[in-house]
């Protein structure tokens, strides 16, 4: 059985994993009624080229594990901007100066934009964590009488 993941769920997963990898100033831009390119842009900042490469590789791997393939990725070594294309969602990770320079938010100023907060986008639980959470509050069998 194949599961289709909706665009908003891919956006939410991408944002959660960006925060999980210490990205900053994460914003989503709703392009559903404005572009045929994709439904969402997700924009984020990072502190260094090393962090940029790490975030891109990690988010790509994390979403692949969730069943979301990357259609294309771009980021040359020493670059100040990287892109992950998940089809309906495109993730842009910038060094701060590059984000200000390219200003995609200004380019899409008429599109709804949302500044994401980490507490609104928790990382999904792994199966092991979910099993552990299911067991919380239960006495062990040793204590049954």
Positions of predicted regions on the chain:
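Short aromatic/hydrophobic contact patches that present stacked aromatics
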Residues: 41-43, 83
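Long, contiguous binding/interaction regions
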Residues: 1-33, 50-57, 66, 75, ...
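Anionic-ligand anchoring segments at beta-strand to alpha-helix junctions in alpha/beta enzyme folds, i.e.
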Residues: 60
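Active-site neighborhood of thiol-dependent amide/isopeptide-bond enzymes
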Residues: 33-36, 41
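Short hydrophobic/aromatic beta-strand micro-patches
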Residues: 43-45, 94
